[in-house]
């Protein structure tokens, strides 16, 4: 079986796709380079925003045209959009052979392979992907927060934490196969709780793995970010000084309408605690503009917060209603053009701040972990999450190297290995 995977959406989807690759590889399946080589094309989908679903539909349209000329190819849709729309996908694209929702992702590999033959169950699955320096591992699935704009609880289900021993063993296996950095994933990692092991305890157990050099995690919810976690970030050298904490808005009125369960004052207090405990921490965030009821004053509160906090980076999104959510019942009263304007204003301010932050690194020497090389250029990352590029050799991959920074752009640094 030759397979081609197209992944849309968050890092959890990337992790799910990696899981499929590892299982397929264990059974001797091969990754195709393009549609022409594939026996099956797998589309891993996202439902968080309408734009992600439109991207999936566009891709399915292209594959449908290909299948008309190559009827033997199988088309499989998995993930969050598959969970939300289910059989309705086949009504629009009859060429789709199999639909597997996010709640059944653990069975996806065998279901896909059974499109071709049925003797897989007796074989042992090897879940390792070799040679990747940075590896992701899902520590929990689902979400119990029910933010009013978000479809995740409906498509991924309620929170379920994975056995901590299973996680640590998998991380150990990844490190033995070359990983040097592990990124722990969950819709809300701060809610992790398996028996008596909470998230801070899980990080301690993970940090004890020999030869593991870095630990990151995402995504965090402000209402659950604990003092214990901040203490771990301050005292455990393997934990990177980088944290993504979605703010979404700085207007308490909008935060309440979003059902975020915290105030802007609480959020700002967390940032101050983090920066006191971990002075070099880089804080990144998500912001939604144009949420129902967001006035000019509400937006200005958010813009002021961006200027005050000076995030290391941010993702800003224009609100779009998602089916089944509470916000979808609200009047979407911010005109599209105004959403675009607010989006542009926040992005411009964020880019200005980012340039100011990275420009301070010009002339400095940064220790980075070399992750990969392409055309003689090494892609590496600082401990606080900045991407760094430099000319180098393959033998640097997986090692810490020092780079003298010569050029700074919004999201990247460039320099020479010293």
Swiss-Prot record:
<keyword id="KW-0411">Iron-sulfur</keyword>
<keyword id="KW-0819">tRNA processing</keyword>
<keyword id="KW-0004">4Fe-4S</keyword>
<feature type="binding site">
    <location>
        <position position="46"/>
    </location>
    <ligand>
        <name>[4Fe-4S] cluster 1</name>
    </ligand>
</feature>
<dbReference type="Pfam" id="PF01938">
    <property type="entry name" value="TRAM"/>
</dbReference>
<keyword id="KW-0949">S-adenosyl-L-methionine</keyword>
<dbReference type="GO" id="GO:0051539">
    <property type="term" value="F:4 iron, 4 sulfur cluster binding"/>
</dbReference>
<protein>
    <recommendedName>
        <fullName>tRNA-2-methylthio-N(6)-dimethylallyladenosine synthase</fullName>
        <ecNumber>2.8.4.3</ecNumber>
    </recommendedName>
</protein>
<keyword id="KW-0408">Iron</keyword>
<keyword id="KW-0808">Transferase</keyword>
<dbReference type="Pfam" id="PF04055">
    <property type="entry name" value="Radical_SAM"/>
</dbReference>
<comment type="subunit">
    <text>Monomer.</text>
</comment>
<comment type="similarity">
    <text>Belongs to the methylthiotransferase family. MiaB subfamily.</text>
</comment>
<dbReference type="InterPro" id="IPR023404">
    <property type="entry name" value="rSAM_horseshoe"/>
</dbReference>
<dbReference type="Pfam" id="PF00919">
    <property type="entry name" value="UPF0004"/>
</dbReference>
<dbReference type="GO" id="GO:0046872">
    <property type="term" value="F:metal ion binding"/>
</dbReference>
<dbReference type="InterPro" id="IPR006638">
    <property type="entry name" value="Elp3/MiaA/NifB-like_rSAM"/>
</dbReference>
<keyword id="KW-0963">Cytoplasm</keyword>
<dbReference type="InterPro" id="IPR006463">
    <property type="entry name" value="MiaB_methiolase"/>
</dbReference>
<comment type="function">
    <text>Catalyzes the methylthiolation of N6-(dimethylallyl)adenosine (i(6)A), leading to the formation of 2-methylthio-N6-(dimethylallyl)adenosine (ms(2)i(6)A) at position 37 in tRNAs that read codons beginning with uridine.</text>
</comment>
<dbReference type="InterPro" id="IPR013848">
    <property type="entry name" value="Methylthiotransferase_N"/>
</dbReference>
<dbReference type="GO" id="GO:0035597">
    <property type="term" value="F:N6-isopentenyladenosine methylthiotransferase activity"/>
</dbReference>
<dbReference type="GO" id="GO:0005829">
    <property type="term" value="C:cytosol"/>
</dbReference>
<dbReference type="InterPro" id="IPR020612">
    <property type="entry name" value="Methylthiotransferase_CS"/>
</dbReference>
<feature type="binding site">
    <location>
        <position position="80"/>
    </location>
    <ligand>
        <name>[4Fe-4S] cluster 1</name>
    </ligand>
</feature>
<feature type="domain" description="TRAM">
    <location>
        <begin position="359"/>
        <end position="418"/>
    </location>
</feature>
<feature type="domain" description="MTTase N-terminal">
    <location>
        <begin position="1"/>
        <end position="118"/>
    </location>
</feature>
<feature type="binding site">
    <location>
        <position position="10"/>
    </location>
    <ligand>
        <name>[4Fe-4S] cluster 1</name>
    </ligand>
</feature>
<dbReference type="InterPro" id="IPR007197">
    <property type="entry name" value="rSAM"/>
</dbReference>
<feature type="binding site">
    <location>
        <position position="150"/>
    </location>
    <ligand>
        <name>[4Fe-4S] cluster 2</name>
    </ligand>
</feature>
<dbReference type="InterPro" id="IPR038135">
    <property type="entry name" value="Methylthiotransferase_N_sf"/>
</dbReference>
<dbReference type="InterPro" id="IPR005839">
    <property type="entry name" value="Methylthiotransferase"/>
</dbReference>
<feature type="binding site">
    <location>
        <position position="147"/>
    </location>
    <ligand>
        <name>[4Fe-4S] cluster 2</name>
    </ligand>
</feature>
<feature type="domain" description="Radical SAM core">
    <location>
        <begin position="129"/>
        <end position="356"/>
    </location>
</feature>
<dbReference type="InterPro" id="IPR002792">
    <property type="entry name" value="TRAM_dom"/>
</dbReference>
<feature type="binding site">
    <location>
        <position position="143"/>
    </location>
    <ligand>
        <name>[4Fe-4S] cluster 2</name>
    </ligand>
</feature>
<keyword id="KW-0479">Metal-binding</keyword>
């Amino acid at each position: 079986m030759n397979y081609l995977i197209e992944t849309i959406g968050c890092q959890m989807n990337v992790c799910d796709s990696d899981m499929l690759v590892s299982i397929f590889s264990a059974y001797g399946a091969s990754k195709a380079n393009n549609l022409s080589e594939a026996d099956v094309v797998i589309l891993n989908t996202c439902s968080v925003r309408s734009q992600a679903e439109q991207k999936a539909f566009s891709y399915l349209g292209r594959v449908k045209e290909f299948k008309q000329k190559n009827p033997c190819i199988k088309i499989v849709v998995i993930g969050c959009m598959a969970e939300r729309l289910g059989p309705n996908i086949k009504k629009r694209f009859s060429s789709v052979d199999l639909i597997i929702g996010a709640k059944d992702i653990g069975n996806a590999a065998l279901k896909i392979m059974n499109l071709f033959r049925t003797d897989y169950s007796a074989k042992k699955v090897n879940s390792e992907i070799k040679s990747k320096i940075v590896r992701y591992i899902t520590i929990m699935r689902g979400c119990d927060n029910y933010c009013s704009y978000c479809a995740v609880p409906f498509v991924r289900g309620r929170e379920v934490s994975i056995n901590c021993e299973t996680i640590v063993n998998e991380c150990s296996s990844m490190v033995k196969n070359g990983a040097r950095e592990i990124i722990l994933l969950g819709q809300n990692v701060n809610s992790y709780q398996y028996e008596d092991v909470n998230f801070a305890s899980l990080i301690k157990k993970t940090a004890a793995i020999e030869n593991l050099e870095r630990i990151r995690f995402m995504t965090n919810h402000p209402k659950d970010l604990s003092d214990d976690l901040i203490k771990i970030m301050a005292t455990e050298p393997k934990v990177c000084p980088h944290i993504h904490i979605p703010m979404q808005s700085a207007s308490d009125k909008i935060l309440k309408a979003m059902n975020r369960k915290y105030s802007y004052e609480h959020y700002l207090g967390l940032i101050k605690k983090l920066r006191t405990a971990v002075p070099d921490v880089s804080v990144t965030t998500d912001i939604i503009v144009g949420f129902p009821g967001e006035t000019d004053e509400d937006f200005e509160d958010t813009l002021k917060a961006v200027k005050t906090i000076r995030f290391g980076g941010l993702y800003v999104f224009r609100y779009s209603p998602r089916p089944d959510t509470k916000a979808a019942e609200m009047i979407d009263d911010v005109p599209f053009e105004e959403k675009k304007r607010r989006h542009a204003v926040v992005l411009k301010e964020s880019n200005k701040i980012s340039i100011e932050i990275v420009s301070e690194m010009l002339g400095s020497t940064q220790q980075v972990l070399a992750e990969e090389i392409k055309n003689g250029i090494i892609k590496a990352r600082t401990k606080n999450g900045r991407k760094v590029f430099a000319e180098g050799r393959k033998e640097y991959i997986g090692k810490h190297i020092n780079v003298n920074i010569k050029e700074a752009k919004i999201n990247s640094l460039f320099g020479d290995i010293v």
